[in-house]
From Swiss-Prot:
The keyword Acyltransferase does not apply. Keywords: Cytoplasm, DNA damage, DNA excision, DNA repair, Excision nuclease, SOS response. Its main location: cytoplasm. One of its GO terms (biological process) is nucleotide-excision repair. NCBIfam families: uvrC (TIGR00194). Interacts with UvrB in an incision complex. It is found in: Cytoplasm. Residues 14-91 form the GIY-YIG domain. This is UvrABC system protein C. Belongs to the UvrC family.
Length: 596
């Protein structure tokens, strides 16, 4: 804890609000909320913490806070700040499932479709469904009951669905708006739990048709009732009423939280969502934040009501979400919450062991490297490699590992601009200079360690750029390879010396992985550039094929190989004039003969 933090801790107010933790670059790494800011923020810098929280605290160099007038204001502000800053320690680890939904489109002639994407498009969404089959079967049922249009574009004449009684044919008839409105209201009622009411209506229609001796019509109503029973009976009943609700339960172990959400629709448990993530404040506060963020996702449609454990203040969530949030105290509803909680306890116990082992390997490997080199644990490592094809198409690549794991969104590729042909040192200087000028210009996070795929010379030119030109003091290490192109040594220091690391250690394994990854990334980019230039050079040699026609051919055929194999007719179908198609075809035929 530095002096700045000590001074700020002394003047913290005892009011609700949000706090923003910052690292040495001033980047916001965590946002939290508190009923009493003074107590919450001070707790981070006193006593001992779980490993995850200790890592967060070790990175805090400064903090800010915003006072609010109430806890609900603090929760809303926290959600907005997380959305704005996307701090790395506020990441929620979820199972990333996408669920199928039924959608009534917002069109002049609405359609009923299945989708896995929920958008803000004024359409009506219903779900989620446990799988595509369940959504499809429900859609088939509704198609028989409510004949909305099926075609994406209206055809010029009626289709088979009209003859099957499953479309009212807006393609040839003028359909009044109230007809659609009535159908949509009935479908909404059905999908929101009014199954029995729909069945009763069908039974009345069936009996009326039978009395009028319309036996085929009566049979159709009977089949529809049977189809409803078949579809609905495949789902397990967990509640005696048909209110749509989400049931939350959570469990905490060793600084990790598991939240399970049961989706109950029409009295049936149809699916669950499981999330496991590290926590850095009171479990109750973390749970409130989780629920708020859960319903920010468009695919999580708010139900009529939500059940949560008794330890949580439901009033805050009711105000935040605008729906009923209840804490059942007895009976079937409490049993549902208990079931979700029990499942969360089992999941966090089982998954925690796997997560802990992985953390030990990845974070442990970073710690081992830091200890061996005598530097702060390198949680952010940036590694560089150069590559070229016999001196041409020279490229460089950078990969980023955070907490011992690849952060692929932060990988970068570079075409060499200024370095001379075969000048590996010049290429390394160029890529280091370009990377860290941009880092300084844009205020991006600096690495804890720069890894160079190379030896002492490569390390020295990187140091000259970082320290002498840019004034940055960042540890630089080199990765040397043996005759078989495998990682053999870690070089570090000034002058560089070999750092002893067991080849079987997690630290050495991490270095191998980083070196293999940056080499793979560089080679892949090199091949892409080489193939691109090869394609350009072949087509550029054909008279009459300019940039536009070259692009036209590649877009149509996808590759030079397929252009080579194309017939004159196929070339004409790709938009080439007959005489040019003949010329291109003849060119590649001649090329083929010359190779034989």
């Amino acid at each position: 804890m530095n002096d700045l933090i000590k001074r700020k801790l002394d003047i913290l107010p005892d009011q609700p609000g949000c706090y923003l933790m910052k690292d040495r670059q001033g980047t916001i790494i965590y946002v939290g909320k508190a009923k009493v800011l003074k107590n919450r923020v001070r707790s981070y810098f006193t006593g001992t913490h779980e490993g995850k929280t200790q890592r967060l605290v070790s990175e805090i160099e400064d903090f800010e806070y915003i006072v609010t007038s109430s806890n609900i204001e603090a929760l809303i502000l926290e959600l907005n700040l997380i959305k704005l800053h996307d701090p790395k320690y506020n990441v929620m680890l979820t199972d990333d499932k996408t669920y199928p939904y039924l959608k009534i489109t917002n069109e002049k002639h609405p359609r009923l479709i299945t989708t896995r994407k929920v958008k803000k498009d004024k359409a009506k969404y219903f779900g989620p469904y446990p799988n595509a089959y369940a959504a499809s079967e429900t859609k088939k049922l509704l198609d028989r009951l409510y004949p909305l249009r099926k075609c994406v574009q209206l055809p010029s004449k009626v289709c088979l669905y009209y003859h099957m009684g499953q479309c009212i044919a807006p393609c040839v008839k003028e359909i009044e708006g109230h007809v659609y409105q009535e159908m949509i209201e009935d479908m909404t009622k059905f999908l929101n739990g009014g199954v029995e009411a729909v069945k009763k209506e069908l039974e009345v229609k069936m009996l009326a048709a039978a009395e009028n001796l319309e036996f085929e019509r009566a049979k159709e109503f009977r089949d529809q009732i049977a189809h409803i029973d078949t579809v609905m009976q495949k789902q397990k009943i967990v509640s005696s009423d048909t209110t749509n609700r989400d049931v939350f339960g959570y469990a905490v172990e060793k600084g990790w939280m598991c939240v399970q959400v049961f989706f109950v629709r029409q009295g049936k448990l149809i699916e669950r969502d499981v999330s496991i993530f590290p926590i850095y404040q009171d479990p109750e506060e973390e749970f409130l934040t989780f629920v708020g963020r859960f319903y920010e996702k468009p695919e999580h449609i708010k139900p009529k009501e939500v059940f949560i454990p008794q330890a949580i203040d439901g009033a805050i969530l009711t105000e935040l979400l605008g729906i009923k949030v209840l804490t059942p105290k007895r009976g079937q509803k409490k049993e549902l919450v208990d079931l979700a909680t029990k499942n969360a306890e089992i999941a966090v116990a089982a998954k925690f062991q796997l997560i802990e082992r992985q953390e030990e390997r990845t974070i442990g490997a970073c710690e081992a490297l830091g200890d061996a080199m005598g530097i702060t644990t390198p949680l952010r490592i940036e590694a560089f490699d150069n590559s070229h094809m016999h001196g041409t198409d020279a490229v460089s690549a950078m990969v980023v590992f955070i907490d011992g794991k690849p952060a692929k969104k932060e990988y970068r590729k570079y075409k060499t601009r200024t370095a001379a042909k075969h000048d590996d040192y010049g290429a390394m200087q160029e890529v280091i200079r370009r990377r860290y000028i941009r880092v300084l210009k844009e205020g991006l996070p600096l690495p804890d360690l720069v890894l160079i795929d190379g030896g002492k010379g490569q390390m020295e030119v990187a140091r000259e750029v970082l320290e002498d030109e840019l004034g940055l003091v960042i540890p630089i290490a080199g990765l040397a390879k043996d005759d078989k192109h495998n990682t053999s040594q870690l070089l570090f220091g000034d002058p560089p010396e070999v750092i002893a690391l067991k080849r079987t250690s997690d630290g050495f394994y991490l270095l191998q992985r980083i070196q293999d990854e940056v080499h793979r990334f560089a080679i892949t980019f090199l091949r892409q550039q080489h193939e691109k230039h090869a394609i350009q050079s072949v087509l550029d040699q054909i008279e009459g094929v300019g940039p536009k026609r070259k692009q036209q051919l590649l877009k149509h055929f996808g590759s030079v190989k397929k252009i080579r194999e194309a017939s004159e007719l196929a070339l004409q179908e790709a938009g080439m004039p007959a005489n040019l198609a003949s010329h291109i075809y003849a060119y590649f035929q001649q090329e083929s003969l010359s190779k034989e």
